[in-house]
Structures are given as C-alpha cells and as structure tokens.
Amino acid sequence: MLSDIEIARSAKLEPVMNIAKNLSIPGDFLNSYGKFMAKISHSFLKNLNIRKGKLILVTAMTPTPAGEGKTTTSIGLSMALNKIGHRSIVTLREPSLGPVFGIKGGAAGGGYSQVLPMEDINLHFTGDIHAVGTAHNLISAVIDSHIRFGNDLDIDLTKITWPRAIDMNDRALRNIVIALGGHANGYPREDGFVITAASEIMAILCLSKDLQDLKNRVGNIVIGWSKNGKPVTVHELGIEGAIAVILKDAINPNLVQTIENTPAFIHGGPFANIAHGTNSIIATKMALGLSDYVVTESGFGSDLGAEKFFDFVSPAADLKPSVAVIVATVRAIKYHGGVPLKDLENENLEAIKKGIENLKIHIENVKKFNVPVVVALNRFATDTERELDLVVNTVEKLGTKISLNEAFAKGSEGAIDLAKKVIEVADESKFSPIYKWDSPVEEKIKILATEIYRAKDVSFSKEAITSLKQIEKAGLSNLPVIVAKTQYSISDDPSKLGAPDGYVFNVRNFKLSSGAGFIVAISGEIMLMPGLGKKPNAVNIDIDEKGNITGLF
C-alpha cells in the first residue's frame, strides 16, 4: 500500500469553489485561500435551516497511546454516505503544530480516508490557530502592562490565572518567571505557557454564535482575582473589542475536501480534557443546514469528548445528536485486556474477552444519553479472523450494531456497511443530557463520576473546596462542568486499564472558564504544554527544491 502522502498526492482535487457551488454557497460568502481552501463567512449561517441534517458523533473506546482512528473513520463514513446517495459533510478540528512536529505527526486522516490538501491543513492552514495565540497573548501583555502602570484593578499577582500560549510542544515553558531585569520590565512573577489548543480563547472561538457573542464571551473571561477576592475580567481591561478584531477571520469556518471530494469543514481545535474537544458550533450548524448527514468527531473516548458533547455542547448550541459511532480496534481491546503494547500484533482471544469490558462500558455510557450506537471496528492487517469474529459476536449479543470499517485501505467502499447501519438507527434518537446545568457543582460531578467513570464516590481536595467556594462567591457555580482527567482510563488513574469500578474519583482543583461558559474540574495531572520526545517528528520533515514536503505522515 502507498504511504499516506503518496496517496494524497495522487488524488484529483476539485477547485474549492466547485465544492462550494455544489453546496449552494454563494460566492459573496466565500474567501479563497488558494485553489483548494476557502473560508465561509459566519454570517452565511443566518440564511440556513439548521434542522435539515442529522448529526452523527464519532467517539471511541478508551484509546491506546497511538489512537484508534476516529478521524479516519469520520472521513470514511462521510464519504460512504455520499457514495450511497446522501449529501454528507464531515466537520473536524484543526491540527495543532505542536503534535505535528512532536510525536503524532499530521492529523488529517490516513490512507484512502484523508482530508486534503494535507500539507496545508497540517502546517498553518488558514492561520486560525495563530490568531487564537495572538489574541490570547494580547490579554497576557495587557495584564502585565496594567500592573506595571498602577494596577487600578488591584490584581493580586499571586492569583493571576491567565497563562501565555504558543502552538508548539515546549516543556521549558511550562513554569517560568517573567519580568526579570529591573522595574522597567514590570513586576516579576511566576507564569507559564499552555499550547494554543488549550487556550480559553480557542474554546470561545468554537462556542461563539457570531462576532458579538464572541466579544461578549471574551469580555467574561476571568484572568485572575483582586486582592479582595473579586474576579477580574477582560471586560474590565477594556480589550474585548481588540480581541474580536484579531479573530474576525478566524471565526469563519474553513472549507476543504476529502480525498473523494466530499466537503469537509475544518474549524477550531479545543482540547477534549480542559475544554470540550469538538470543532466550532458555527461549522457544525452550517453543515447541518447544507446536508442530509453531518459527521463530527469528539476528542478521546466517550468518557471525555462525547460526554462533553452531550452534556455541554449540544445544550449550548441546541443540537440533537442522531447517532453515536464508537470506534474500536482489536489492538485497543487487547491492550485493555492486559497485553503490552509490543505484543498487540499477536493473536490473544483471552485478552479480548477481558478487554472488551472497556468497550461495553463505552456502549453503555452513550446509551445513557438515549442516543443509538453503532460500533465501528477499525480493521488492521494484523487482526485475525478469530479475533474479529469474537469482537463482532460479543457486541451483537449486546443488541448493538457493529461494522468492520476498512476506510483506511478502501476509502468510501470500506465504510459503506457502516454508513448503512448508521442510517438504519438515525431516527431512533431520544437524546437527553445526563445532568441539569442548574444542579450544584458537586452533584454534577458525582453523576459523571458514578454513571460515566464508574466510581463509587467522589473526593474533593482542600484546594478544590477553596476554589469552588471562590467560584460560588462570584455567582458562577451554575455553569456546566467540564472534567479534565486522563484519556487513557475511564477512571482518574491512567494505569487503571479495562473496566475499573468501585474506586473514589478525586477532584484536585477547579478552574473557571467563564468566557467559554463552564467550570473545569481537574482530576489528576493534566498536561497543557506537551514536550518533544528524544526524536520528535520534526527530524523527519523536510522540503525539496520543488517545494515537495516529506515526513508529515
């Protein structure tokens, strides 16, 4: 089989304006970025009936460190839906440069299930992430300038919660001291960087309905606390208008295409632990108004991205998911059955019998939201027929549809069975979130911990209790909860693979994201600034005299 980049370069792309024309998007709402990429004005959304299409959410079982192929599945499913006569659009998050140059490489699908032009999407794209980083750091700069010139807002230097941001993996920037070198440079204090995808600005961009909503949300950001314990907002700094100006183009969804010319909206890229982990609401709603089926993807497993999509994104955007596709692999099932990473290519039926309990939990979790489930079993060359049969038979006995997905190797042809099974259940959804937003914070977390993470109880640290009291005092405790925890276990401990239960779920602290509109409950150590490995993917990336890029895949 050809490499991903060889497959991508052999594809025959349609001019992006043709893709837009086929979707009936008027030229007045388009801004072309070269021949194969364009931005669609967010104002076009006002012309659409967003109830037209059905929304398909692609999630996964608890992944291995390598991931299980959600993006490839999402792209393949959308192409297959088009192949069998339905208009479909896939909506995805934008790749971050940090992982591109780090361990992961490119993030535009793979094999015969890719979004293109791959090099452009992975490297800068249309500049959205750069705009987010610039907006984020303008706030940081104004905070320290405000303090330097009198600190009229009486900001407590020890309680500034707004870090700086950069779209790169750089562990040396996690914890730093700024403003060294004398009084002219400001007041020295501890600070740090997060990767841009973890910025609250990114979450706001993906949750905003329009520029005015974005401006209001930015103004509501709490950047820290005053010496008398009151929240200090961006609105008090007076720069929400400037931030909106920086993001005026970034708020517009990006239009590209798959390897088979299926339309793809790629817009925004918030983390699925510290934030909600799905592409922009504007892109999803626009796609719903232009197609029969919209395929969108949530980050990590169903305990993280899907739960947040159901409990937070859907109510916030008035979305009604029709189907959830849970991506599973034989290797991930064996991994949760106790098989080391180095041995995952070896047949092991006993490990599958044990590890499939993890998949069962994810199926049960999604069904608690009254959304029908289809399992997409991504097929790998090392999977044996006995292993595949065991997984299929076990899932079918649960009363859940399952499809062998071969979109990576066969494109849309490899996902037609999956598409048909999704359509079969698409009218059965009776979607409902699992908790009410106006419930107490502790109650919301206990529901998630016991129902989704399978804990027996919840423990709050002293720091968490203090932080929550501060949030309650500010009158912001009625916001929904985003739980930041490990993606490698349904529990709060990454070493607990499979189907752990009966444990105490620990909440270490709370973080207020009032601009985005949620409270983050932090469990365990959450890495917001990754580091590069000993041999990062950057050493594989190169460009020749003709401009051909190598090493992204």
From Swiss-Prot:
Pathway terms, separated by semicolons: One-carbon metabolism; tetrahydrofolate interconversion
Keywords linked to the UniProt accession: ATP-binding, Ligase, Nucleotide-binding, One-carbon metabolism
ATP-binding is among the record's keywords: yes
CDD domains hit by this protein: FTHFS
GO molecular function list: ATP binding; formate-tetrahydrofolate ligase activity
InterPro entries, sorted: Formate_THF_ligase (IPR000559), Formate_THF_ligase_CS (IPR020628), P-loop_NTPase (IPR027417)
One Pfam family per UniProt: FTHFS
Residue stretches spanning the membrane: none
Top-rank taxon: Bacteria
GO aspect biological process, one term: tetrahydrofolate interconversion
EC number, UniProt record: 6.3.4.3
Residue positions binding ATP: 64-71
Catalytic activity of the protein: (6S)-5,6,7,8-tetrahydrofolate + formate + ATP = (6R)-10-formyltetrahydrofolate + ADP + phosphate
Coiled-coil portions: none
Family membership: Belongs to the formate--tetrahydrofolate ligase family.
Descriptive protein name: Formate--tetrahydrofolate ligase
Native species: Pseudothermotoga lettingae (strain ATCC BAA-301 / DSM 14385 / NBRC 107922 / TMO) (Thermotoga lettingae)
Protein's gene: fhs
